[in-house]
Amino acid sequence: MSVPSSAVRTYRITALAGDGIGPEIMQVGRAVLDAVAAQVGFSLQWQEGLIGGAAYEATGDPLPPETLKMAQESDAVYLAAVGDFKYDTLPREKRPERALLGLRAGLGLFANLRPVKIFPQLVQASSLKPEVVAGIDLVVVRELTGGIYFGQPKGIFTDAKGSRRGVNTMAYSEAEVDRIARVAFELARKRRRKLCSVDKANVLEVSQLWRERVTAIAAEYPDVELSHLYVDNAAMQLVRWPKQFDVILTENLFGDILSDEAAMLTGSIGMLPSASLGSSGPGVYEPVHGSAPDIAGQDKANPIAQVLSGAMLLRYSLDQPQAADRIEQAVEAVLAQGYRTADIYSEGMTLVGCREMGEKILAALAQQQASPQGSLSAPGG
């Protein structure tokens, strides 16, 4: 059934293609989002901004003020990838990756969500035994703005005797722990209602406060089962039996490490999306993988993480869960048909490039419902 044009809701999305393979995977992601929007009955108004190396080349700034303003005025930010080895010699504040910190700060983002779900068709791609990884479906919720990356004092200091000393400070306030805990509990409530909080409360005072506050917030969610693990044990358990986890909540440094460990359970980082959220305003949705400059422009990139990041955008920022489900089902259908990009290819499968993988996903969407579909040659404008 068609939707009357007057009833169609329009969302403003900021697209930040960035560097390396970013423009290629962004083209696929936008086409898929436009296609599913046409099916479900809403529209996307795209605005393009510069970020990372591309922004530095054009403006001398990896995050130009106009890009941040555009992001702040949008309903969601769809990001591809930033960075290139050629920028490694730039001053730290000019490097492409610094744009991500500025974007998160400018949008007030404090919660990073990384879903880790293995498609049945890719169980063999994992380095772990199939019986260990089959059925994995967990989310790592990482606090983004506190902890040792931001605590003060920090730096390298020289004492009176001329000896240098490096200092970083891991610190969290009650308010910071409470707000990230509520994000994790709300997410767990919508899933299997199990939350595991990861800390190092046996030796770190900051973790003792973390555990105390998470336990206190748990009283607001009696329907969610809370458990605690020390981070070293959590790292071991993720490899030993990852299916025990539903939602993992942890602080910045621990989350940085555990989310990458969890990512590799699936066999390819090219499959994994992420979301960074705040209390209000637009979230940022991006693949976990980097810009892969070594394969940029060669049609070799895997666009699936970008596509699945779009599904998260629909679910968390636009409140369009039906559209998100359609995208995820289309990706699974294409994998079931045996199509693989190089990073997930195995013998007997059909090797395709970035663009063709996108076309296959669009075709799978079209099979779900006979509606006008997007095209990779003309993503929405």
UniProtKB/Swiss-Prot annotation:
The keyword ATP-binding is assigned to this record: no
Residues that hold Mg(2+) according to the record: D232, D256, D260
Entry keyword Kinase: no
Compartments where found: Cytoplasm
Site (Important for catalysis): Y149, K200
Top EC group: oxidoreductase
Annotated transmembrane regions: none
GO BP term, pick one: L-leucine biosynthetic process
Function per UniProt: Catalyzes the oxidation of 3-carboxy-2-hydroxy-4-methylpentanoate (3-isopropylmalate) to 3-carboxy-4-methyl-2-oxopentanoate. The product decarboxylates to 4-methyl-2 oxopentanoate.
Protein name: 3-isopropylmalate dehydrogenase
Species per Swiss-Prot/TrEMBL record: Synechococcus sp. (strain JA-3-3Ab) (Cyanobacteria bacterium Yellowstone A-Prime)
